Amino acid sequence: MSPDILLFISDQHAPQYQAGGQMPVDTPNLAALREQGTAFDAAYTPCPLCVPARMAMLSGLSPHHTGIFTNNDTLPQTTPTFLHAMATAGYETVLVGRMHFIGPDQRHGFTRRVAPDFTNSGWVRPQKTLEQDFGVHTQTMGYKWCIDVVGGGASPVVCYDDMVLDALEQYLAQPHSKPQLIVVGTYGPHFPYVAPPELFLKYLKTAQLPATWQGNEPWLNAQQRNLQEPNTRAEIVLACQAAYKGLVEHTDGLIGRARAAFDVFTQNRGTPALFGYLSDHGDTVGEHGIYGKKSFFEKSVRIPMVFAGSGVWALVPHKGHSTCQSAGPWPHRV
């Protein structure tokens, strides 16, 4: 019997930020997933940027083969993805939420989309539309303004991610005849660095400055310095750290919701279940004076990757003995 599969893909989650990680965060659902499955602790993104990483993951091709190096590039409609293969094998391939497709093809092998994306699907978006959608957070979606608004409060990221999980739960409450391959895409814990107030205050109490937060290392090259936010006050760095941890904990809660709904769904169907979690890239969160991705520092390029369920060994951590990446052969062996 074909297993039902759910892949939960977050955006910009550095795996150092989790329970037991270098930067501890309360992530009980991710910890349970790791205990019950196989975690790849040396997993890396093929490119520390959203669209190149995601298209590499779907196609199994590195960015230098896809030709996708920026968030404005488009995966050709003629490029097959593992979703095409799964649909051919009889699966209903469902996208719930984010994937950051650019261009007219908003499927690339998905036979169904249940919730919209967070970001634009084209190359131009009117400024007034952005301001209407994101309000005071409009500029914080970009690298050079991502720390202009930080702290605890209402966030379009949190609102969007909650909507995605609502849509997933509604979809899983319905009967489906075909085997299911469901990809859940959230935008968190991507900046803006604004978390639910209670989570922000929780982590602000213990927030610490990264050792390299001032970014004055003499060996940084011109590209790395171009990514820096110079002269950032210490309290802003601490607020970014606290908000990012709060966003990670919020994402962990969504992982728990997704897994609980998926377990009920597969139990009702009497089918084997496979659940996976990963992110497209990480976030330096102020280390070396850099926020977000686009650098090859460890917190930017390492990603969480863990699978549990049918056919997956439990309690098997792969810690640093060999590396893997999200553009490797794993999607094509699902």
Tell where the protein language model's regions lie, with residue ranges:
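Formylglycine-dependent sulfatase
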Residues: 1-334
